[in-house]
Swiss-Prot record:
Record's cofactor remark: Binds 1 FMN per monomer.
Lineage: Bacteria, Pseudomonadati, Pseudomonadota, Alphaproteobacteria, Hyphomicrobiales
GO molecular function (one): NADH:ubiquinone reductase (non-electrogenic) activity
Binding residue positions for NAD(+): Y12
HAMAP family hit by this protein: NQOR (MF_01017)
Catalysed reactions, as listed in the record: a quinone + NADH + H(+) = a quinol + NAD(+); a quinone + NADPH + H(+) = a quinol + NADP(+)
Residues the record lists as binding substrate: W98
Species name: Rhodopseudomonas palustris (strain ATCC BAA-98 / CGA009)
The protein's name in its UniProt record: NAD(P)H dehydrogenase (quinone)
Gene3D superfamilies: 3.40.50.360
Signal sequence region: none
Record PROSITE patterns: FLAVODOXIN_LIKE
Length: 199
């Protein structure tokens, strides 16, 4: 049975919700799924004053965890059109895994959130996907089998490169059911691919 890691960073809970949806989809495909988060780099007093969501249940991942999975789906909010520094810092520590080819052939994917529709969703996904490709992974996006990413009757995230959500400038907008459905669809597709490749 394929093992899937949903690895995320979420300051305000939007990506945490998307991570749970990705995991639901992967489980639906028959995979064993773990959800883990990367360490917070912001000092605790600053995080509290900034109203970060500090009660997230997912355990903190280690770099060596990555080698134990057939698929890794990475999610993080956008910071100025790229992944958050917390995720970047974590992935920057994976040089040892890269050097020994420990991630070659594993399945990977990306998901993100932005404050606005044009806040850098695709560039953030690319910043994650670039890492996955350097690690030698097989990247699976959000294919057009999920047709709701092309809806025009509502504000909705989603791109062929990965599931996304739009939070609003003040962060008050939570992922819509359409966006969560996209995350579930991508999680299921990634797990199905991992099962085909790794059993």
């Amino acid at each position: 049975m394929a093992k899937v890691l949903v690895l995320y960073y979420s300051a305000y809970g939007h990506i945490e919700a998307m991570a749970n949806a990705v995991a639901e989809g992967a489980r639906e495909a028959g995979a064993t799924v773990d959800i883990k988060r990367v360490p917070e780099l912001v000092p605790p007093d600053v995080a509290k004053a900034s109203h970060y969501k500090l009660d997230q249940a997912a355990p903190v991942a280690t770099i060596e965890d990555l080698a134990n999975y057939d698929a890794i789906v990475i999610g993080t909010g956008t910071r100025f059109g790229r992944m958050a520094s917390q995720m970047s810092n974590f992935l920057d520590q994976a040089g040892g895994l890269w050097a020994r080819g420990a991630l070659n052939g594993k399945v990977g994917g990306a998901f993100t959130s932005t404050a606005t529709q044009h806040g850098g969703q695709e560039t953030t996904l690319f910043s994650i996907i670039t890492n996955l490709l350097h690690f030698g992974m097989v990247v699976v996006g959000l294919n057009y089998g999920f047709g709701d990413q092309m809806r025009l009757d509502q504000v909705t995230g989603g791109a062929p490169y990965g599931a996304t959500t739009i939070t609003g400038g003040d962060g008050s907008r939570q992922p819509s059911e359409t966006e969560l459905a996209g995350a579930r669809y991508q999680g299921k597709t990634i797990a199905e691919t991992a099962i085909k490749l790794h059993g």
